[in-house]
From Swiss-Prot:
UniProt-recorded name of the protein: Trigger factor
Gene name tied to this protein: tig
Residue intervals of the PPIase FKBP-type domain: 162-247
Keyword terms, alphabetized: Cell cycle, Cell division, Chaperone, Cytoplasm, Isomerase, Rotamase
Organism classification: Bacteria, Bacillati, Bacillota, Bacilli, Lactobacillales
Gene3D superfamilies: 3.10.50.40, Trigger factor ribosome-binding domain, Trigger factor, C-terminal domain
Primary subcellular site in the record, as a coarse category: cytoplasm
Species this protein is from: Lactobacillus helveticus (strain DPC 4571)
Note on domains (UniProt): Consists of 3 domains; the N-terminus binds the ribosome, the middle domain has PPIase activity, while the C-terminus has intrinsic chaperone activity on its own.
Length: 452
């Protein structure tokens, strides 16, 4: 295959390539088989025309467009690979020549990934993380579990924040009832934020049997557009007031909330270990995020093509909607429930698309520079893990994802680990002082440049 690559811009170029006569012949044969079943030629039954008769009657050129559509995708992919370019998006391909019994020549206008110049990605300074678990952390978790296991008991007297009231309510706007504005025997925890702002506050300080006229204004960004920004009156009847009775903090409580322990001390030790694990995981995530952010900041990346931004948005959208569907929610149902649409979701993902693409480009450059590879065993494990995560069989995963795609994900994670493992934790105050100094130096340099 003859392939020529000519760069016309930082992220654009022209790719000229040939499609061999042998490939064209296969494409013509396949195109003929597709059209032959619907052919009407005088003197022949429908679908029983030979290739020779077809060429005599219509000419071989009648198959060229279909044949080109058949052979072009593989020919273009092979040309991209041979040229050693990282093409993105859809190319614009035009024929240069399509002569009979000769190779065909094509010219493609191609968008390619921007050039990445790596800066320092080892030894990135990141804020030091505190993973110590304090007694107050354990106490707070115990309090939370007591709250979760509290018993609601009838309360005499006025309601307070944290109490649960059983109410009937009927809402009106300008004297007219509206859909979803009424309920009977509804249990509402005061201070939970379950209702629109102001509703729960107006029920505090009342007793069972009280009638309360609750007046609120729906938020301007309220999901139901016909209610947004409007004042509503809720005629509310309080039937019961209940307060939380917290369980006693003892061995019995410990066994009730966790059947793997026998004493309160054992529960405390278990909670402390769980909190330690959580803090260490959160610390590792924070270190990784800061280290990668530093590596990206130190790198220089040419302007990112729109095609890469759109590809990223498409990927994010498909992954998000795919997760929804795995939970049994189809896209249209999701849009209805959230009062959104596809365009709004795309706009949301587009906000950070450029940064995501830049980060991925820098990580890919690190993969290449460090010569990171994925072994067959790692690819096999990746398939097993994905099959378990998405409840799919391994064969389906293998048919859906190529080894190259899996290898890419594995090696990018290796690059992330490499950057993280080589990061240096420093005191936050020291790091902030250094960043402030760097910002000041940058500002001074810009001032000098302007005053020249």
């Amino acid at each position: 295959m003859s392939v020529k690559w000519k760069k016309t811009g930082k992220t654009t170029g022209e790719l000229t390539f040939d499609i061999s006569k042998d490939e064209i012949k296969l494409g013509l044969d396949q195109a003929f088989r597709r059209v032959k079943k619907n052919l009407h030629v005088p003197g022949f039954r429908k679908g029983h025309v030979s290739r020779v008769i077809f060429d005599q009657y219509y000419g071989e050129e009648a198959l060229y467009e279909d044949a080109l559509n058949i052979v072009l995708p593989n020919a273009y992919s092979a040309a991209v690979k041979e040229a050693g370019i990282a093409a993105v998006g859809q190319p614009q391909i035009v024929p240069v020549s399509m002569d009979k019994d000769k190779d065909w020549t094509m010219k493609a206008t191609v968008t390619v990934e921007p050039e990445v110049k790596l800066g320092d990605y080892k030894g990135i300074e990141v804020p030091k993380q505190n993973t110590r678990v304090y007694q107050k952390d354990v106490d707070a978790e115990l309090d939370k579990r007591r709250e979760q296991n509290a018993e609601l008991v009838l309360k005499k007297g006025k309601s307070a924040k944290g109490d649960t009231v059983t109410i009937d309510y009927k809402g009106t706007i300008d004297g007219k009832e509206f859909e979803g504005g009424s309920a009977e025997n509804y249990s509402l925890e005061l201070g939970s934020g379950a209702f629109i702002p102001g509703f729960e506050d107006q029920l505090i300080g009342h007793e069972a049997g009280d009638d309360v006229d609750v007046v609120v204004t729906f938020p301007k960004d309220y999901g139901a557009k016909d209610l947004a920004g409007k004042e509503a009156h809720f005629a509310t009847k309080i039937h019961e007031v209940k307060s939380k009775q917290l369980p006693k903090l003892d061995d019995e409580f410990a066994k009730d909330v966790d059947d793997s322990v026998d004493t309160l001390d054992e529960l405390k030790d278990k909670i402390k270990k769980q909190l330690k694990d959580q803090k260490e995981q959160a610390a590792n995530d924070a270190i990784q995020e800061a280290a990668i952010e530093g590596a990206v900041k130190n790198a220089t990346v040419d302007e990112i093509p729109d095609a890469m931004i759109q590809d990223d948005v498409d990927t994010q959208l498909n992954q998000y909607l795919g997760n929804m569907q795995r939970q049994g929610i189809d896209p249209q149902t999701y849009y209805k429930l959230t009062n959104t649409n596809e365009q709004q979701l795309r706009s949301q993902f587009a906000k950070n698309a450029a940064e995501r693409v830049k980060t991925n480009l820098v990580l890919e450059a690190i993969v290449e520079k460090e010569g990171l590879k994925a072994t067959k065993e790692e690819i096999d494990k990746e398939i097993k893990d994905l099959a378990a995560e998405y409840n799919m069989d391994e064969k389906t995963i293998r048919n859906t994802l190529s080894d190259d795609m899996l290898s890419h994900d594995i090696t990018v994670r290796k690059a992330m680990d490499l950057v993280t493992d080589n990061a240096k934790q420093v005191a936050k105050a020291k790091l902030e002082a250094k960043e402030a100094e760097e910002a000041e130096d940058k500002e001074e340099a810009e001032d000098k440049k302007e005053n020249k």
